[in-house]
């Protein structure tokens, strides 16, 4: 499941470029997985491709869209109109992926009423009191938290109380939710720390290799 969105993004890019077919080897390479793993993933969709031809790009993208629940637009409400919230509403890729930003909310009176996003489709920041009506009338199915850490749990609680069951959390905070609520956390600092760890490991391994090589030369001298 975690790899399907990656396949979907790559396929949509190729479809937009007019590409019609792709082999499992090409798609796997573009997505950073092995061809065997790709074929296994896609077999669960009932898609095996055509020998000698490969996969139909648009049809495979549609199959994955259906599996991910993207054949119908999903409404997204963002709480937090700071730099991150503004960047999210300005991103043009959501619509092509089946997501519509239906609200950008903030607690600060001086921010409410401002307009952000793409010039052709700007979004006006609303007050937090708009959250419940947006969820109640079915406009939003997913909530995004783009607030400071200290406000994240309270915002999450309010989203859940309003009826949202899917939350994407950008705040550097661990959220506690009742059973049946799915929270996905995006912590850029943690991801950078993981990369730094692997970079450090590579540097240490390289240093050890150089030491062994130097020792070998000394012994053979």
Spell out what each predicted region is.
Residues 1-6:
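Short, Lys/Arg-enriched anionic-surface-contact patches
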Residues 9-19, 23-162, 178-192, 196-203, ...:
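Hydrophobic, well-ordered beta-alpha structural blocks that scaffold small-molecule cofactor pockets
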Residues 147, 170-172:
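Short secondary-structure boundary segments
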Residues 204-212:
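Intrinsically disordered or compositionally simple regulatory linkers and C-terminal tails
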């Amino acid at each position: 499941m975690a790899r399907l969105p990656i396949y979907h993004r790559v396929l949509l890019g190729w479809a937009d470029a007019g590409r019609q077919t792709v082999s499992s080897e090409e798609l796997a390479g573009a997505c950073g997985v092995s061809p065997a793993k790709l074929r296994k993933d896609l077999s669960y969709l009932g898609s095996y491709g055509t020998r000698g031809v490969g996969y139909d790009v648009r049809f495979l993208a549609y199959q994955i869209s259906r599996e991910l629940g993207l054949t119908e637009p999903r409404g997204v409400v963002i709480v937090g109109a700071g730099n991150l919230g503004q960047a999210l509403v300005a991103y043009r890729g959501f619509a092509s992926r089946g997501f519509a930003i239906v609200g950008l909310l903030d607690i600060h009176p001086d921010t409410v009423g401002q307009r952000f996003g793409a010039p052709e489709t700007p979004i006006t920041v609303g007050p937090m009191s708009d959250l419940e009506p947006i969820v109640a009338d079915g406009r939003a199915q997913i909530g995004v938290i783009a607030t400071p850490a200290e406000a994240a749990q309270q915002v999450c609680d309010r989203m859940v109380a309003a009826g949202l069951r899917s939350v994407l959390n950008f705040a550097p905070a661990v959220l506690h939710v009742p059973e049946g609520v799915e929270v996905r956390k995006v912590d850029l600092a943690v991801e950078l720390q993981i990369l730094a760890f692997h970079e450090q490991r590579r540097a240490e391994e390289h240093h050890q290799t150089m030491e062994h090589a130097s020792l070998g030369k000394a012994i053979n001298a």
